[in-house]
């Protein structure tokens, strides 16, 4: 199917966004849509009562001018959600013999896949503790510092930190997350940790190209039915909430990144309904961002299941790459063991024209060992078939890597 542009949807009368956390997968029933929840395998969905924001005016910012005479190629990889649920923290502790936390074995099979792109980016959906204290419990997360060490050791270069669990340990947790990532040579894109501090964009430089990443979430405080609120002491968080920032603001941020020299701009979006398909608001926001010419790839996460990819105006949208690593139980929430590691190759010719192509590696998380495994036609074949089918539902031309 030829790439296509979506028509911009009218402003929705209700925001089609899921405002829950990510539960780990206990056998208890899922919380009601009006109760606070978090990343466990039994999460609830809710529709906020507030109206969706107006996002008009994205076309008022001129599209970037092509850079001529400088052919270049770069491949960028992106994962689904990484979540250190309490159950996986306990398993990592046991694997380390009670001394520290051994997360690296969970990821070992995917190391060559993550290392292959020029740059690889993760979705870090939990704070990180510098002192390994106050760690993850149900509905509220905090990972040991070794989680970042393992993430870096498998080949990731940086992570998005904008998600509904960003504030799970408050401002101190945000500060420690940035410190732990930096200590492990991982860049971070997401909200700043204090007023006046710009948490993004973050820049990567390779192959003569400068790549910017911006990250936004529907909520940073795991609010149910509320995409507008932030803690009184942290008003700056609204700059990383796409519902308050609006598409116009995101496009403005992307244009500012280009003004700082970015050749490519990636936008990570924590959005959508958990365990469901692409919704109307995701399509609306996609249209508004992609028609601007400022955004080169939208990397979506949060639903914890793989959603289709699309190509809009020649640029990729991966609506949700599923889970890369979590403690969620697929027997309770089907599809949460499946993921896709996407790799997009960007090629610029001498005339300054860009071309994109994508491959994706289906992944499967073993439900007993919690190890992340490759999925292929001969290994974890059911998961492979589901992921390949889902990725192609919107006519995306991406190809499975195995």
Regions found by a protein language model. Give the residues of each.
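Short, low-complexity, disordered segments immediately C-terminal to signal peptides
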Residues: 23-58
């Amino acid at each position: 199917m030829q790439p296509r542009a979506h028509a911009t949807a009218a402003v929705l009368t209700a925001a089609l966004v899921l405002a829950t956390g990510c539960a780990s997968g206990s056998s208890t029933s899922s919380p009601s849509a009006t109760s606070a929840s978090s990343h466990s395998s039994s999460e609830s969905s809710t529709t906020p009562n507030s109206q969706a924001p107006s996002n008009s005016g994205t076309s008022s910012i001129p599209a970037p001018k092509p850079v001529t005479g400088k052919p270049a190629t770069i491949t960028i990889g992106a994962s689904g959600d990484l979540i250190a649920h309490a159950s996986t923290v306990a398993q990592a502790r046991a694997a380390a013999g009670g001394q520290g936390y051994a997360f690296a074995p969970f990821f070992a099979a995917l190391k060559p896949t993550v290392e292959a792109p020029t740059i690889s980016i993760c979705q870090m959906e939990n704070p990180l503790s510098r002192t390994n204290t106050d760690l993850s419990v149900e509905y509220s997360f905090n990972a040991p510092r070794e989680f970042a060490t393992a993430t870096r050791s498998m080949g990731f270069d940086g992570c998005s930190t904008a998600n509904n669990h960003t504030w799970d340990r408050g401002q101190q947790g945000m500060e420690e997350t940035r410190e732990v990532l930096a200590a492990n040579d991982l860049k971070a894109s997401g909200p700043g940790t204090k007023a006046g501090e710009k948490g993004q964009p973050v820049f990567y430089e390779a192959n003569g190209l400068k790549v910017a990443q911006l990250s936004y979430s529907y909520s940073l405080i795991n609010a149910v039915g509320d995409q507008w609120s932030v803690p009184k002491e942290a008003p700056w968080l609204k700059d990383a909430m796409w519902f308050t920032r609006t598409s116009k603001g995101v496009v403005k941020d992307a244009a500012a990144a280009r003004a700082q020299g970015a050749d490519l701009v990636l936008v990570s979006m924590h959005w959508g309904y958990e365990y469901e398909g692409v919704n109307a608001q995701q399509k609306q926001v996609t249209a508004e961002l992609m028609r601007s010419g400022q955004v080169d790839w939208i990397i979506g996460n949060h639903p914890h299941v793989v959603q289709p990819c699309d190509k809009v105006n020649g640029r990729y949208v991966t609506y949700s790459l599923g889970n890369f690593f979590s403690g969620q139980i697929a027997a309770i929430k089907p599809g949460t063991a499946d993921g896709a590691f996407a790799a997009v190759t960007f090629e610029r010719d001498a005339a300054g024209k860009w071309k994109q192509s994508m491959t994706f590696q289906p992944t499967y998380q073993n439900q007993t060992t919690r190890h992340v495994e490759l999925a292929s036609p001969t290994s974890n074949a059911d998961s492979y078939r589901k992921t390949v089918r889902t990725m192609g539902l919107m006519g995306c031309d991406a190809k499975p890597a195995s």
